[in-house]
Amino acid sequence: MTKKYLKVDVVSPLGSVFKGEADMVSLRGSAGEMGIVYGHTELLSTLPAGVVNVRKGQHTDVLYVSGGIVEVTPTRVTIMVDDMERAENLNQAEAEKARARAKEVLKNPDASKLDIEAANKRLKEADARLKALNSSNGLYYSKDD
């Protein structure tokens, strides 16, 4: 029997940013962690900023996504995002600086509600970048200090 793979497509406003096949796609959706394999039931979910793992055999592509929507059919996973980066292209120092800057805004008692919302978003994105970077290196990253 021939092995059946999921078709995986990550698209941004710029077009397709990742195409591949997978034994399994793992990600965090609105209802929590999901592992998606060939034959999965159809679903549509929102995604927070986070990590998407696309595994085929012994190889795993680790992707940072800025958040978006995932559509699953029995044979395909389509992820629509504003931004996506492969973990190996992420810069740890930049992500740590972004995290520190966001935390500084959150500590400021004079920060506006708009500044606080933007800082919370940037903090979640920086945490997701660090998690993607560290998980691609076989490390565990916790956003808690």
From Swiss-Prot:
Its main location: membrane. Keywords: ATP synthesis, Cell inner membrane, Cell membrane, CF(1), Hydrogen ion transport, Ion transport, Membrane, Transport. GO terms for cellular component: plasma membrane; proton-transporting ATP synthase complex. The keyword RNA-binding does not apply. It is found in: Cell inner membrane. It comes from the Bacteria. It is a peripheral membrane protein. SUPFAM superfamilies: Epsilon subunit of F1F0-ATP synthase N-terminal domain. InterPro entries: ATP_synth_F1_dsu/esu, ATP_synth_F1_dsu/esu_N, ATPsynth_dsu/esu_N. GO terms for molecular function: ATP binding; proton-transporting ATP synthase activity, rotational mechanism. PANTHER family: ATP SYNTHASE DELTA/EPSILON CHAIN, ATP SYNTHASE EPSILON CHAIN, CHLOROPLASTIC. HAMAP family: ATP_synth_epsil_bac. F-type ATPases have 2 components, CF(1) - the catalytic core - and CF(0) - the membrane proton channel. CF(1) has five subunits: alpha(3), beta(3), gamma(1), delta(1), epsilon(1). CF(0) has three main subunits: a, b and c. Belongs to the ATPase epsilon chain family. Produces ATP from ADP in the presence of a proton gradient across the membrane. This is ATP synthase epsilon chain. It comes from Francisella tularensis subsp. holarctica (strain LVS).
